[in-house]
């Protein structure tokens, strides 16, 4: 399709879906699993009207169904609820100061270290309730190393979110390399990849997780999800004055908006090519472990392609015009929001 647009008011999304050759799969239990939206709202009273809007338009159920297509209903529900609370944490830390992010981290990590035995407190932070409920259900079936990996990677998310908050308070603009390193933590993708193990009932040995090729595959999948997200979320984030990879390139390298978007698109394509090359370089650890590794790598691919398609199904990035924009790839630039 030939796309013609007024580049002063619009930009063109790169066709990442066509370049990504991974098949899109969907969990057959999608409709049987209850709504994560209702779960989060019911377990987390007192959210602001703006937060409720974001939760309701997220559609974590579809994302979980695309990214964890092989699990049963119970595990799909846990995965969907995890994604719902994770996106909520991402939203609220985007505007928090460092101290607030640190307090939030303490609340969540307290729940995630609890082994499901936390007593309710009268003064308990509201977000602790859904976090505690989620963790209690997760550890019923999650193997020990998978629990540790998810918890450690949530801790990494908060560590980098605190660093991001500190930079935001100080008006620091990161260079591209520094931003990419931070984004690998703030994306929280590695915790989602731990859920891949959980969803299919495997537990990769630590020596496999530490293997350089497996590490490279994890990093590439993380980058692919993060960079496509930065492209798709750019319009909303620029309107609210939030920096992402596009803005970093525009300010640090003097690129125009469309050139910056195309730059990230090129990085995406190079990275997916590298991912495919690395899948052919995996060593062998014996038939049983190799079979689990194949399932895990398939799960990384499910995450990459699932995130691409979900980005147009959710109303988070393009409102109710997702299907239209998926077809045309033309996005009208939103006006800047006034600073409150």
Swiss-Prot record:
It catalyses: (2E,6E)-farnesyl diphosphate = delta-cadinene + diphosphate; (2E,6E)-farnesyl diphosphate = bicyclogermacrene + diphosphate. (2E,6E)-farnesyl diphosphate binds at residues 316-317. Mg(2+) 3 binds at residues 229, 233, 237. Belongs to the terpene synthase family. Its EC number is 4.2.3.-, 4.2.3.100. This is Sesquiterpene synthase 6. Keywords: Lyase, Magnesium, Metal-binding. A motif (DDXXD motif) lies at residues 90-94.
């Amino acid at each position: 399709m030939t796309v013609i647009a007024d580049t002063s008011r619009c930009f063109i999304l790169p066709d990442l879906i066509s370049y990504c050759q991974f098949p899109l799969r969907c969990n057959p239990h999608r409709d049987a699993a209850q709504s994560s939206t209702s779960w989060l709202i019911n377990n987390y009273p007192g959210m602001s009207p703006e937060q409720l809007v974001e939760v309701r338009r997220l559609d974590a159920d579809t994302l979980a169904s695309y990214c964890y297509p092989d699990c049963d209903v119970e595990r799909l529900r846990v995965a969907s609820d995890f994604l719902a609370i994770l996106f909520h944490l991402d939203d609220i830390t985007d505007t928090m100061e460092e101290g607030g992010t640190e307090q939030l981290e303490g609340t969540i990590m307290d729940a995630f270290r609890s082994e499901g035995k936390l007593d309710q407190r009268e003064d308990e932070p509201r977000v602790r309730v859904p976090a505690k409920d989620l963790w209690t259900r997760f550890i019923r079936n999650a193997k020990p190393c998978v629990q540790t990996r998810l918890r450690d990677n949530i801790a990494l998310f908060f560590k980098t979110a605190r660093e991001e908050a500190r930079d935001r308070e100080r008006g620091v603009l990161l260079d591209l390399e520094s931003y990419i390193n931070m984004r690998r933590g703030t994306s929280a993708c590695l915790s989602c990849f731990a859920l891949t193990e959980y969803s299919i009932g495997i537990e990769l040995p630590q020596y496999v997780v530490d293997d350089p090729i497996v590490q490279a595959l994890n990093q590439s999948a993380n980058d692919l999800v993060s960079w496509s997200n930065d492209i798709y979320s750019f319009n909303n984030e620029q309107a609210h004055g939030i920096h992402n990879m596009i803005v970093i390139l525009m300010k640090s390298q003097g690129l125009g908006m469309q050139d910056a978007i195309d730059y990230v698109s090129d990085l995406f394509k190079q990275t997916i090519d590298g991912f495919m090359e690395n899948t052919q370089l995996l060593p062998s650890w014996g038939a049983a472990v190799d079979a689990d590794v194949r399932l895990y790598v398939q799960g990384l691919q499910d995450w990459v392609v699932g995130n691409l398609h979900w980005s147009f199904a959710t109303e988070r990035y393009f409102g109710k015009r997702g299907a239209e924009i998926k077809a045309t790839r033309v996005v009208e630039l939103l006006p800047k929001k006034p600073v409150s």
